[in-house]
Swiss-Prot record:
This is Glutamate--cysteine ligase A, chloroplastic. Homodimer or monomer when oxidized or reduced, respectively. The keyword Disulfide bond applies. Keywords: ATP-binding, Chloroplast, Disulfide bond, Glutathione biosynthesis, Ligase, Nucleotide-binding, Plastid, Transit peptide. It is an enzyme of class 6 (ligase). It comes from Oryza sativa subsp. japonica (Rice).
Length: 492
């Protein structure tokens, strides 16, 4: 790769395997993203790392394209990475947990289950163990970024292990964790703020670019899957398919019907929130469906996205309002003379939030957080569609004549009406039935006996009742118009 020959990088030495981890138990680690590493070069929990970089000449656009191209992998090396967020709460009061309580949980996990701490300005802000990490979202949402795994059995085992560990430590502190897409009870002012530098910059910037950005930061939880591609053409097909079907996944996994103690008018308020968070960096990316689309076109898109920050001398420098294109030519007033490294590019790509996101893999970002069975079901659903050639081709054919207007309509209406959203001569539920069958077929052909993980999705589609509608029914009947029982209903 061109970039490899032009950057001399001082890298952190390996940790010496399991024995080394035991020696350093509970001590901070630093993860260094490099252009040559596989999935997850940057650890989600970490502050950005500062490589000792001697630039022989500035990065070019070709280097940025090459960074994305380096994600291409032969099919035998494709992996499945799952990320999921959850709300911590005090079992006695149902109140959101504060940073001090979260710090105690992180310390407890580090001591008891051999995780390494990640520290920013003397605050524990995450954990790392092998290729897994635990990080904190702005309002203290607890996120597991899973390791890249080969099968969905491994994925579900990882989810279960994580939930077991978090529950074991949390229960002793009177803390529970809730699997839902939007905070059902508490106002924005009730949510604690995590001590992470990048979030302070985002918190100040969000109200300038949309009315719901702070809700996105502090009151939402999602589950997403990260999947590989073999070539530019494979990436394009998967990107287009993922975007077209993202509203269908939003409907199936809709699980955020409450806000501040009552129904909010949506089945997936979390999904709706993204429509007025920051339209410069979110949405359905119609240009992905242009004939000219490829890695270079995505780089052009990302270059013009306003930046959030640059990380220098262990500090976040607020660069809001400037583009990465400005940075490429040294035109950041906040960091005069600074030029970007690949680290800066990698960090910038994490501040773009479309329904499907391209890094050196593709992220499917349309689903609400939910209980553990749905955390396993979401990656299964997408793997059956995108990792099987026959299913992927069938979906590509099915969606090839969908217009931008139709895709935008689904994106807009599904958060309100879910599976009952009209589409052409039927409903989203009809589409979901067809897509589910294609996913099952793809899983059968994979040959790992993974179809069973789709039972939860099967039940939703066959009944036509989304998880959110089930909760709304409980609210009106058994719960006597109180949201408090949801904390028990969706407790991990």
């Amino acid at each position: 790769m061109a970039v490899a020959s032009r950057l001399a990088v001082a890298r952190v030495a390996p940790d010496g395997g399991a024995a080394g981890r035991r020696r350093r138990r509970g001590r901070p680690v630093v993860a260094v993203p490099t252009a040559g590493r596989g999935r997850g070069g940057a650890v989600a929990a970490s502050p950005p790392t500062e490589e000792a970089v001697q630039m022989t000449e500035p990065l070019t656009k070709e280097d940025l394209v090459a960074y994305l191209v380096s994600g291409c992998k032969p099919k035998e090396n494709w992996r499945i990475g799952t990320e999921h967020e959850k709300f911590g709460f005090e079992v006695d009061t149902l109140r959101p947990i504060k940073y001090d309580q979260i710090r105690d949980i992180l310390n407890g996990l580090a001591e008891r289950f051999d995780w390494d701490k990640i520290v920013e300005e003397n605050n524990v802000i995450g954990l790392k163990q092998g290729k897994q990490s635990i990080s904190l979202e702005p309002g203290g949402q607890f996120e597991l970024s899973g390791a890249p795994l080969e099968t969905l059995h491994q994925t579900c085992a990882e989810v279960n292990s994580h939930l077991y560990q978090v529950k074991a430590v949390g229960e002793e502190m009177g803390i529970g964790f809730l699997g839902i897409g939007f905070q059902p009870k508490w106002a924005l002012s009730d949510i604690p703020i995590m001590p992470k530098g990048r979030y302070e910059i985002m918190r100040n910037y969000m109200p300038k670019v949309g009315s719901l950005g702070l809700d996105m930061m502090f009151r939402t939880c999602t589950v997403q899957v990260n999947l590989d591609f073999s070539s530019e053409q494979d990436m394009i097909r998967k990107f287009r398919t993922g975007l077209a079907l993202q509203p269908i996944a939003t409907a199936i996994f809709a699980n955020s019907p409450f806000k501040e103690g009552k129904p909010n008018g949506y089945l997936s308020l979390r999904s709706h929130i993204w429509t007025d968070t920051d339209n410069n960096r979110s949405g359905m990316l119609p240009f992905v469906f242009d004939d000219s689309f490829g890695f270079e076109r995505y780089v052009d898109y990302a270059l013009d996205i306003p930046m959030y920050f640059v990380y220098r001398n262990k500090k976040y420098i607020d660069c809001t309002g400037m583009s990465f294109r400005d940075f490429m030519v040294g035109k950041l007033p906040q960091a005069p003379g600074e030029l970007p490294t690949l680290n800066d590019w990698e960090n910038h790509l994490t501040t773009i939030f479309p329904e499907v996101r391209l890094k050196r893999y593709l992220e499917m970002r349309g689903a609400d957080g939910g209980p553990w069975r749905r955390l396993c079901a979401l990656p299964v659903f997408w793997v059956g569609l995108l990792y099987d050639e026959e299913s992927l081709q069938s979906i590509s054919d099915m969606t090839s004549d969908w217009t931008n207007e139709e895709r935008e309509m689904l994106r807009r209406k599904v958060p309100v009406t879910g599976l009952k959203t009209p589409f052409r001569d039927g409903y989203v539920r009809d589409l979901a039935e067809e897509i589910l069958q294609l996913s099952k077929n793809g899983l059968e052909r994979r040959g790992y006996k993974e179809v069973g993980f789709l039972r939860e999705v099967d039940a939703v589609i066959s009944s036509g009742v989304t998880p959110a509608e089930r909760l709304l029914n409980l609210y009106e009947t058994k719960w006597q118009r109180s949201v408090d029982p949801v904390f028990q209903e969706l407790l991990y």
